[in-house]
Amino acid sequence: MKYVRCVLLTGALFNIAAGLKCADSKVLSRYKVSQHAAKGKFTESTPPSETTDFWWINLCEEHSEPVPDKCKDDAMFCHRQQVKLDDGKEYVTQVFDVPRNQEVDVEELRDGFQVSFTGKWGERERKVKVRYTCADDKAEDEVSAEGAFGAHTTPVEVALRGPSGCIQATEKSSGIGGWITWLVIYAVLLTLIYLLAKSYMSVGHGSMQDFREEFVERSTNLVSSLPEFAKEVMGKVVGGGPSSRGGYSAV
């Protein structure tokens, strides 16, 4: 069963259980996160070896993408650490993945949003925080991790910068255009209510046929007068109306 729990923080905080369908989230549905999966790779020299961390996150169940090697099939988040020795041999030393049935907290921020969840790594529970920010000039999300994964007492903090943290195009376009649309809708509704009320008052206790004829006549008169009204308004706006000048004119 899915549910949403709201808490007042910097933004709105939502708790979502079961597989995360982003379209059902009030916050996540506004962003492009359901269209992308993020992955990152970081290599560090750790003599006598070389250590590489692989990060992968596919937050929304709407987006389908193969899970990386060594990660569980039902993972929505996975971190894999791999060590390459100086003889060229490679070993996977750590795998930490979080299944889709984990609860996910979503917090909307001023410059994006943050998700947090908890997964089990061996006998320990690890808290993960992933922060999304928008970079609409990038085709894929860039992943960076803050702090060492081996610090078991601190949360795993991952930062994603890319298209996933950007608001949907329909959300951006709603502004002045949206207000104009609503104003037109309200104007039409108020006009319709006015015509119905005036028609009803005119016929009094007359028949339904009388009311319909009165309503049609008033509506027709209103529609036929609109072009002349619009022409008069445009004339006032463009021409500024007739100007008067005092004094005598030369003959």
From Swiss-Prot:
Transmembrane ranges, per UniProt, are 176-196
Where does this protein come from, organism-wise? Eremothecium gossypii (strain ATCC 10895 / CBS 109.51 / FGSC 9923 / NRRL Y-1056) (Yeast)
User: Which segments does the entry list as coiled coil?
Assistant: none
Q: What does the similarity note say?
A: Belongs to the ATG27 family.
Q: Which GO terms describe its cellular component?
A: clathrin-coated vesicle; cytoplasmic vesicle membrane; Golgi membrane; mitochondrial membrane; phagophore assembly site membrane; trans-Golgi network; vacuolar membrane
Q: What is this protein called?
A: Autophagy-related protein 27
> Which GO biological process categories is it annotated with?
cytoplasm to vacuole targeting by the Cvt pathway; pexophagy; protein localization to phagophore assembly site; vesicle organization
Q: Where is the MRH domain?
A: 20-168
| Role | Effector of VPS34 phosphatidylinositol 3-phosphate kinase signaling. Regulates the cytoplasm to vacuole transport (Cvt) vesicle formation. Plays a role in ATG protein retrieval from the pre-autophagosomal structure (PAS) and is especially required for autophagy-dependent cycling of ATG9.
Here the disulfide bonds are: C22-C60, C71-C78, C134-C166
**Domain of life the protein comes from:** Eukaryota
What is the membrane topology here? Single-pass type I membrane protein; Single-pass membrane protein
Where does it live in the cell?
Cytoplasmic vesicle membrane; Golgi apparatus membrane; Mitochondrion membrane; Preautophagosomal structure membrane
Please name the InterPro entries in this protein's record.
Answer: Autophagy-rel_prot_27, MRH_dom
Q: What is the lineage of its organism?
A: Eukaryota, Fungi, Dikarya, Ascomycota, Saccharomycotina
- Where are the Cytoplasmic topological domains? 197-251
Assigned keywords, A-Z: Autophagy, Cytoplasmic vesicle, Disulfide bond, Golgi apparatus, Membrane, Mitochondrion, Protein transport, Signal, Transmembrane, Transmembrane helix, Transport
Q: Which GO terms describe its molecular function?
A: phosphatidylinositol-3-phosphate binding
| Lumenal compartment segments | 20-175
Leader sequence residues = 1-19
